Amino acid sequence: MSDPITLNVGGKLYTTSLATLTSFPDSMLGAMFSGKMPTKRDSQGNCFIDRDGKVFRYILNFLRTSHLDLPEDFQEMGLLRREADFYQVQPLIEALQEKEVELSKAEKNAMLNITLKQRVQTVHFTVREAPQIYSLSSSSMEVFNANIFSTSCLFLKLLGSKLLYCSNGNLSSITSHLQDPNHLTLDWVANVEGLPEEEYTKQNLKRLWVVPANKQINSFQVFVEEVLKIALSDGFCIDSSHPHALDFMNNKIIRLIRYR
């Protein structure tokens, strides 16, 4: 049995065997480790490959088993496909193509469920009336919460690209607030009368905007209208059997379905 070989792939170390690396002779790795192509070394003497180290584990596992094993919530399919193209592992490229067809079929039929909650609370803040002179004030504030679930990860990504948080005076994508690929929770406030801009930052109050309309969402009615525009354009339709009509009209529950 040959000695173990340690690879440095983009800064991540992997240890394997020569037999594994040459299991597909026509691949770039097969050429590199059969002496047909030169290899580079890092300062520790490990074989260095200047590619993405994170997804290389899936490529290495495929070399070992000839099976494509990915977690259910895998989100780097595009990156893995590019890396497979680089290493020229043809059976892996074909397995990825089959996997993408499978995922595409699963994404066509989808369900979208949104539960909405709203409350009013009092916010206290200081107002600068003159240099060194401040007064304490308060105002009612509408606080909104939307709990969004969809069986389509791609739709949630699309929705996340259209909605932006306004915080610290800047607009930022809400995609970082995805709890997992199928869940998204949003919390935001409407404009508060008399509240200075710096107080939104100080009290960590986020406002919500939608693009490309560049419209601030100050009510559930506007939120529902904008989400429906995005969902309907992506092939969803309202599920007339659920929820109860009163819940839908009162903006408490929204359920949409998509059949393709």
From Swiss-Prot:
Keywords: Coiled coil, Growth regulation, Tumor suppressor, Ubl conjugation pathway. It comes from the Eukaryota. Pfam families: BTB_2 (PF02214), KCTD11_21_C (PF19329). Pathway: Protein modification; protein ubiquitination. Residues 88-112 form a coiled coil. Residues 3-72 form the BTB domain. InterPro entries: BTB/POZ_dom, KCTD11/21_C, SKP1/BTB/POZ_sf, T1-type_BTB. Highly expressed in cerebellum and brain. Expressed in adult cerebellum (at protein level). GO terms for biological process: protein homooligomerization; protein ubiquitination. Probable substrate-specific adapter of a BCR (BTB-CUL3-RBX1) E3 ubiquitin-protein ligase complex mediating the ubiquitination and subsequent proteasomal degradation of target proteins. Promotes the ubiquitination of HDAC1. Can function as antagonist of the Hedgehog pathway by affecting the nuclear transfer of transcription factor GLI1; the function probably occurs via HDAC1 down-regulation, keeping GLI1 acetylated and inactive. Inhibits cell growth and tumorigenicity of medulloblastoma (MDB). Homopentamer. Interacts with KCTD11; KCTD21 and KCTD11 may associate in pentameric assemblies. Interacts (via BTB domain) with CUL3; indicative for a participation in a BCR (BTB-CUL3-RBX1) E3 ubiquitin-protein ligase complex. This is BTB/POZ domain-containing protein KCTD21. It comes from Mus musculus. The lineage of its organism: Eukaryota, Metazoa, Chordata, Craniata, Vertebrata.
